[in-house]
Amino acid sequence: MTTIIELPEVLANQIAAGEVIERPASVVKELVENAIDAKSSQITVEIEESGLKMIQITDNGEGMSHEDLPLSLRRHATSKIKSQSDLFRIRTLGFRGEALPSVASISKLTIKTATAEAEHGSILVASGGKIEQLEAVSTPVGTKIKVENLFYNTPARLKYMKSLQAELAHVVDVVNRLSLAHPEIAFTLISDGKQLTQTSGTGDLRQALAGIYGLNTAKKMIDISSADLDFEVGGFVSLPELTRANRNYITILINGRYIKNFLLNRAILDGYGSKLMVGRFPIAVIDIQIDPYLADVNVHPTKQEIRISKERELMALISTAISESLREQDLIPDALENLARSSTRSFSKPEQTSLPLQPSQLYYDPQKNDFFTKETVVSEDSPQGFNHEVLIDSDVKQVDNLQVTKTESEAAAPSVKYASRPDPMLSDGEHPGLDVHNKQKLSQMLDRLENEEQSVFPELDYFGQMHGTYLFAQGRDGLFIIDQHAAQERVKYEYYRDKIGEVDNSLQQLLVPYLFEFSGSDFINLQEKMSLLNEVGIYLEPYGNHTFILREHPIWMKETEIESGVYEMCDMLLLTNEVSIKTYRAELAIMMSCKHSIKANHSLDDYSARQLLLQLAQCKNPYNCPHGRPVLINFSKADMEKMFRRIQENHTSLRELGKY
């Protein structure tokens, strides 16, 4: 008696669904790709409960005939290839005939479809892969597919679904990638009756970028174009000043298909060279047209991983295209645009002003217990920040106020203002080897900081500075050289650590609320994790599509830090996911202390330098910055005498050493 049997078709489809359909986003991907292959110009995706309850895809494509409709649920039944040779010149997104049978086997499926030639349309209803209804019906040309109760008969898969917000974020990401791959198609995504994404379908990729990432982001994207005998490369990449904390904003398309490829990602970064900060990544949409013979898409069940012939040549083409496009741009960030980040789009941009090329002079304000610069004139009652950049911000805001006064009769004062992301190019790379998102390094750093013990700091007498970076002081134990950035970073770290640790319900109302823009998937993920932000006193409310509004801020955060601080905290939250409040606050203290400390090449006057040393002496651990770097080094009197050979460890003569 034989023990090998042929599995029933429904069971085989359920097994195949385990590879093809991982989550609701997989269903959306497969069905939308079918709609694209059907030459649709409008595709609407509607979901309920993140797709677990209902997914409906409506298109205006070619549709299916009454005879073809039941065949579409047969495994490996397809209209896209007919012979073995077709497998090597695939230009459609689907070709295996697995998607619809797999979806039908684990859900209740309803298909309404009609072709332009048919007198009437057709409706098909299937449950668990079995057709229950097939009849004629009146319906517009195109196809409407409704998937209900996904995974109802595979409880193990349903059990391991993530939260509804997480699954919704995956759906949004899929629709966004497909929208970028096909800007000629008008996409609409509706979740529980609320529209999340909409693109115009004009064929303009930059317009699609604006619909997904926001207008401000699209304005800072530059187009790339290059070609050789085998490849055509086009698309858009962000200026080096516009970056993100992970690679999720890089989209690679081959013949209209979104793929994942580590080497091509590497080629994009290589195109930027040293223009990107460590741990930062660009926003990029790279559209590659390739002869189908050079690409094998029949590798992975989801077809997101493909094999490419001449991959090294393609990498070089992408890198060259990006580097040449960047070379043509003026990569010096607009000073007033960076400094006047709080100005709204309703105001005209002021003319560029030239800044004097002279060393920055930092001074100490004993009343505010902080440093400031005299490069610009600051009113006595203007808020003081932690470094010279913030002070210049204060001046720019005063200029903006003057502008409002002049145009008051023409336009009312804004009720909200768009926040700008911090420019990573403003950083001086004090810690290029440390990525705060490296969890292993971060965990070790936090453990060390948590176990610090109170230290005794020597009494120092400051007497000079070198290269605007190192302070010189003498004490009972000899000469001390202090790294001024590391010193104030330690001071600021302990300040922020204590302040953030005191987070309570004390909030300060903003006169003009801030708006913070995010991509669709990040917006949804942040909504799910909003309670973590609330723990540190950040309360963001949804305000339109992909936008949050901030109406008040915690008292420990100065108003001049709101834009950069909130964006940085959100980026950190998106990356760390399950971070504890304790760890989150420690990460925040480290991050803010580094960004708000004195940088290299800033000259300190004598009074300011002495005040910094006094603040350092009051720290719990004044000897290391939060990253573990030494704050100061010591040359004892004996060390100095040895270096100048005033004393020797032994009295062996040169003659005895054989020198003479």
Swiss-Prot record:
Pfam families: DNA_mis_repair, HATPase_c_3, MutL_C. Keywords: DNA damage, DNA repair. It comes from the Bacteria. Disulfide bonds: none annotated. SUPFAM superfamilies: ATPase domain of HSP90 chaperone/DNA topoisomerase II/histidine kinase, DNA mismatch repair protein MutL, Ribosomal protein S5 domain 2-like. One of its GO terms (biological process) is mismatch repair. GO terms for cellular component: mismatch repair complex. GO terms for molecular function: ATP binding; ATP hydrolysis activity; ATP-dependent DNA damage sensor activity; mismatched DNA binding. Gene3D superfamilies: 3.30.230.10, Histidine kinase-like ATPase, C-terminal domain, MutL, C-terminal domain, dimerisation subdomain, MutL, C-terminal domain, regulatory subdomain. PROSITE patterns: DNA_MISMATCH_REPAIR_1. HAMAP family: DNA_mis_repair. This protein is involved in the repair of mismatches in DNA. It is required for dam-dependent methyl-directed DNA mismatch repair. May act as a 'molecular matchmaker', a protein that promotes the formation of a stable complex between two or more DNA-binding proteins in an ATP-dependent manner without itself being part of a final effector complex. Belongs to the DNA mismatch repair MutL/HexB family. This is DNA mismatch repair protein MutL.
